[in-house]
Amino acid sequence: MCKSEIFAKIINIVSKETEVPVDQILSSDKNMETVDARYLLVSLLSESGMYPSQIAVHIHKTKRAVNYMISNFYERMESGKMLRIYWETTDFT
């Protein structure tokens, strides 16, 4: 499976699970539900083997922003119950 197929599969799963539209996840929207969906997307992409620079290109963010999301995912998950639920129940395989 190529990178774009992996990205498409995972972003669609995240969108379905979080009920946040794909275009909103990829936007610069900063409401909590959208940001949680974006963090979940980045973490799942990272877990699937994509490099931060590859993720950055797909989500239209900087590599630094992607690294920040990866580094702070578990901290954000501790403060957000829904993000933890999404992480524990999302099956992206």
Feature roles, as predicted:
Residues 34-50:
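Short, amphipathic alpha-helical "recognition" segments used to contact nucleic acids or chromatin
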Residues 63-67:
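Helix-turn-helix DNA-binding helix
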